[in-house]
């Protein structure tokens, strides 16, 4: 869920969704850095009771002090570090300060396939998950998919079907069936690059 960022309204939304889908579906709350500590704690306790699977980005990522406090008060796993400063070395500080239960990254934000793999391995060394954020466009989604299938500590492939300007770069986009995506079997990224699009949109060539 990406709710509105107002604590009481977000709690009501979380309740309504849980009632709507029942208890079998895993639900997660992404508050998108919306709260101060008190509201973050209030929402966290509410979604714990609703059996939400994790609690993402309740506070701004500069507020490590209150993340530590929040993690001490709540049982629901906290996930943060999507845009945390310091990237690889900064993430190590989040782990050693016990400020989050799971790391977050993707090929675009983290800096590519290799840095994202390093981040996953860093989390793995502490027996933690590194859940990979959606890529935002077709090419990034495919690159994320490769990393997810190469590491043992990412449970979900977060995928928003691309539309409009974000659907580019591939002859055919990722297809999923009943919530599942199959691994590509072709070389490289495993999907055919749309070179015709690249030629049509070509502006200049750097020598």
Model region roles, listed by residue range:
Residues 1-140:
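Catalytic core of soluble alpha/beta enzymes
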Residues 114, 119, 135-207:
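Flexible C-terminal active-site loop/helix
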